[in-house]
Amino acid sequence: MDGKRRPGPGPGVPPKRARGGLWDEDEAYRPSQFEEELALMEEMEAERRLQEQEEEELQSALEAADGQFSPTAIDARWLRPAPPALDPQMEPLIFQQLEIDHYVAPARPLPGAPPPSQDSVPILRAFGVTNEGVSVCCHIHGFAPYFYTPAPPGFGPEHLSELQRELSAAISRDQRGGKELTGPAVLAVELCSRESMFGYHGHGPSPFLRITLALPRLMAPARRLLEQGIRLAGLGTPSFAPYEANVDFEIRFMVDTDIVGCNWLELPAGKYILRPEGKATLCQLEADVLWSDVISHPPEGEWQRIAPLRVLSFDIECAGRKGIFPEPERDPVIQICSLGLRWGEPEPFLRLALTLRPCAPILGAKVQSYEREEDLLQAWSTFIRIMDPDVITGYNIQNFDLPYLISRAQTLKVPGFPLLGRVIGLRSNIRESSFQSRQTGRRDSKVVSMVGRVQMDMLQVLLREYKLRSYTLNAVSFHFLGEQKEDVQHSIITDLQNGNDQTRRRLAVYCLKDAFLPLRLLERLMVLVNAMEMARVTGVPLGYLLSRGQQVKVVSQLLRQAMRQGLLMPVVKTEGGEDYTGATVIEPLKGYYDVPIATLDFSSLYPSIMMAHNLCYTTLLRPGAAQKLGLTEDQFIKTPTGDEFVKASVRKGLLPQILENLLSARKRAKAELAKETDPLRRQVLDGRQLALKVSANSVYGFTGAQVGRLPCLEISQSVTGFGRQMIEKTKQLVETKYTVENGYSTSAKVVYGDTDSVMCRFGVSSVAEAMALGREAADWVSGHFPSPIRLEFEKVYFPYLLISKKRYAGLLFSSRPDAHDRMDCKGLEAVRRDNCPLVANLVTASLRRLLIDRDPSGAVAHAQDVISDLLCNRIDISQLVITKELTRAAADYAGKQAHVELAERMRKRDPGSAPSLGDRVPYVIISAAKGVAAYMKSEDPLFVLEHSLPIDTQYYLEQQLAKPLLRIFEPILGEGRAEAVLLRGDHTRCKTVLTGKVGGLLAFAKRRNCCIGCRTVLSHQGAVCKFCQPRESELYQKEVSHLSALEERFSRLWTQCQRCQGSLHEDVICTSRDCPIFYMRKKVRKDLEDQERLLRRFGPPGPEAW
């Protein structure tokens, strides 16, 4: 029952019941209201008794569990500081809120508040932390959900009570069996004056109805019933169009009270009540307050600070079976390692390793060992409640660690384990989630509820924010932190666990490192700070940023601005629509430019266009509306796409106001950042200016989202239309002014333009001159556009290689004309991740020789050497690995894909470790019979090494290297010559040696030995033929020398891996597929075995050797 029932908000709150009831099938007979209420009361009483029984069982389990940590085992540093002795009548309660949600519970009487009229009411719950690090839960009472609808013609005050009664009765009938609804569904219907934000109508506010409901979940049925129509005396059955009926209850509350995500809240003295006993949560301070008494501090000045939050990072290890990925129904959890950090401190204050069976001590960490897995799981659950983290992080905790722990505890019947949140008695449950978008494809994931704690899975953050070749923790740590980690295959973990206390210690160190790295990533990438600032800027709860899409952020800002002006957001049904023309790209003048190219960039182009031309929902004129409203030509504009909007002199748009606020706030934040010296405040300010920039740019995207809350094709297509016009005008202005006729040394030419920038060749020879002319041109062109549109000088490229649209490279100069900042590449294989590393490395190396060294001959020679090495099998396999994301099931792909077919084959070999949806699949292309499709030749790199499968080097040359190299060298060498020099010639006449062990004819062929000297086939098992026997000693020495070289190489690689794992005295067991050393070590080990086998053919030394 527990697994199927949706958990409620806390003790004493009955769970919700599914829609429908006893009388659904018999519409002719309806029970009286008294009979319905009587049946409901009996059901509620039964639920209450059942819940009390469950709570007693949980409480006894928890009391037994708390004994898992003896007083001596609990480090005092784990505990939060003791809460102060607050006097609610004299002292305010101030805290930074992290999460806001709501639950439904019996109303509580509060001083100064009217007596509650409902048995069950929605109560908002804000979790947070004080400046001293004390945890707080604030129950906010008295706020009810509401929405608007236009009053139908003829509707007057006399119809208010009738509409309230009829709608309430309709909702009650619709919600039969809803246990929480014990009073009227509609609390109030009021007449007010408002105006729709969609379109300029010219008539000002009109009559609207504000409908207040008893519960948030009644919003959807109320909206549906109103759209169907409600019978009213004298008005017939009018249909009502809902406004703001799709706004989340928490967003509604935050908008109305001017609360933004992660800001500081103040409960004034004398306005709140502390709960000394009977608390519903594990928080140290628990308060009740009326919603109208909460004071919200805007995140500015001293209120920008971040409370000393407790961040917990953890990782688990499981003992799987050979060849099978761990399953929670069968495989035990053997270790759980946790690290705790107080935000703002440089080092974790807590390092804890909980292990199954004894483990040797670990310096700097506390080790707790258990003989029973049930005790281990219960101890970690108890530890979570003792340590009480505000933020929980890790790597893939959302899809593996947390679901595994909960499922395993359920299998072992550990009763108190799932109580991981802050609400007493509320279990953490797992639900499946699926997300699909055009950019990311489909991602299946799990969601674990943990009320009161923010979950930040670093894997999910990186998947959403960064485009990487691989997303394993090892690859990500190397990319961002510059450090590697030992990666132990799940099959080896069981062997370490079954060893002794030292092998278990090694496993615990590995597990601690896996918990430590996500914490480092969280800090290095400023994930928490940036997310908090984004929540503050957009006004949504922190949890929404991590689990919801982009649109809710703009909706929140739109609602806040609209509320100040009496405007309402309509509920728009969208199913996708027509597309529109995107930004302009000026046709590139391809080539290699050995002169400086100045780049001029429009600052915040799309937001600037929307502000300059007052483009908004509120200013949009429908076709013919300008004439009907009697507007003159100077009161509205016609955009390049033919759409019409009123000017700011008639009405200032909401979107331009929002954008002005965001960009001016960003300007202030950047000015403060320039002066600030405190590193923590610098982090906050940097996160704030970034959040403001992203938010401003997302407003345009919100209007263009065809399946969205409020799409408006007229706005989005007008913005891109103005953008195209501006790019073309900029080109014309630059090429008209900077000419020989106007006194300049050379006539300027715009060689390329893309969306918001143009690349200009002024014909000067020095970077300093190009910078001066670029600044002058930017200022001059800006004067031809309305404010705040501004063209800025951004950088100079010298030299510059322009290959095609969206593809170019050059040395970038932005501040100093005498030193380049970096080599900048766009759209080239040096920065793309859909090819093998060999391509990126070769393209980067070639560009460096072309652009930095100015050595085209050296670049050509290097490319030829790499091609020769490839064809002669001298390239390490790690450089040939291609990775592609598995975005959907095999059947959903239109054609056969190499990575999809390999994933299916790997699933047949080992279902547990096969890639799943959302994973990136690494593969190499192997040789096969002529005509075999490429998707059939994909193979797992490790499988290729273990079975000595030959690589299809021609595929890598023709399909991976050829096009990128020709793109770079054709502008320099010429089209025909580049192909002849790079892809033909002596360096391509290399013979590869096939060494496969499986597949094809090799599976049926019988191997015969050859003479090591002359390669003649031998009839015996010796090393040399009779003709080479006089040289046997010389050949033997040569092979021994080769063996020594291989041993030395293997020793160097082994030592490097030992340094990475942190011990020079233990075997290397790392199997990180993202590390090139791993593939080298595997290859050299195999070469060593082959070389030793070859030397054994010489036989034992004869007597003459002694």
From Swiss-Prot:
SMART domains in UniProt: POLBc
One GO CC annotation: delta DNA polymerase complex
Protein localization: Nucleus
The entry's keywords: 4Fe-4S, DNA damage, DNA excision, DNA repair, DNA replication, DNA-binding, DNA-directed DNA polymerase, Exonuclease, Hydrolase, Iron, Iron-sulfur, Isopeptide bond, Metal-binding, Methylation, Nuclease, Nucleotidyltransferase, Nucleus, Transferase, Ubl conjugation, Zinc, Zinc-finger
Residue positions of motif CysB motif: 1057-1075
Function: As the catalytic component of the trimeric (Pol-delta3 complex) and tetrameric DNA polymerase delta complexes (Pol-delta4 complex), plays a crucial role in high fidelity genome replication, including in lagging strand synthesis, and repair. Exhibits both DNA polymerase and 3'- to 5'-exonuclease activities. Requires the presence of accessory proteins POLD2, POLD3 and POLD4 for full activity. Depending upon the absence (Pol-delta3) or the presence of POLD4 (Pol-delta4), displays differences in catalytic activity.
GO molecular function annotation: 3'-5'-DNA exonuclease activity; 4 iron, 4 sulfur cluster binding; chromatin binding; damaged DNA binding; DNA-directed DNA polymerase activity; nucleotide binding; zinc ion binding
Other comments on record: In eukaryotes there are five DNA polymerases: alpha, beta, gamma, delta, and epsilon which are responsible for different reactions of DNA synthesis.
Record entry for activity regulation: Regulated by alteration of quaternary structure. Exhibits burst rates of DNA synthesis are about 5 times faster in the presence of POLD4 (Pol-delta4 complex) than in its absence (Pol-delta3 complex), while the affinity of the enzyme for its DNA and dNTP substrates appears unchanged. The Pol-delta3 complex is more likely to proofread DNA synthesis because it cleaves single-stranded DNA twice as fast and transfers mismatched DNA from the polymerase to the exonuclease sites 9 times faster compared to the Pol-delta3 complex.
Ranges for region Disordered: 1-28
Written domain comment of the UniProt record: The CysB motif binds 1 4Fe-4S cluster and is required for the formation of polymerase complexes.
Record-listed E.C. numbers: 2.7.7.7, 3.1.11.-
Assembly, per entry: Component of the tetrameric DNA polymerase delta complex (Pol-delta4), which consists of POLD1/p125, POLD2/p50, POLD3/p66/p68 and POLD4/p12, with POLD1 bearing both DNA polymerase and 3' to 5' proofreading exonuclease activities. Within Pol-delta4, directly interacts with POLD2 and POLD4. Following genotoxic stress by DNA-damaging agents, such as ultraviolet light and methyl methanesulfonate, or by replication stress induced by treatment with hydroxyurea or aphidicolin, Pol-delta4 is converted into a trimeric form of the complex (Pol-delta3) by POLD4 degradation.
The record's free-text note on cofactor binding: Binds 1 [4Fe-4S] cluster.
Motif mapping: Nuclear localization signal: 4-19
Zn-finger (CysA-type) residues: 1011-1028
A Pfam family it matches: POL3_N
Signal peptide bounds: none
Record has RNA-binding as a keyword: no
Full protein name: DNA polymerase delta catalytic subunit
Positions that bind Zn(2+): C1011, C1014, C1025, C1028
Reactions accelerated catalytically: DNA(n) + a 2'-deoxyribonucleoside 5'-triphosphate = DNA(n+1) + diphosphate
GO BP field: base-excision repair, gap-filling; cellular response to UV; DNA biosynthetic process; DNA replication proofreading; DNA synthesis involved in DNA repair; DNA-templated DNA replication; error-free translesion synthesis; fatty acid homeostasis
Main location (coarse class): nucleus
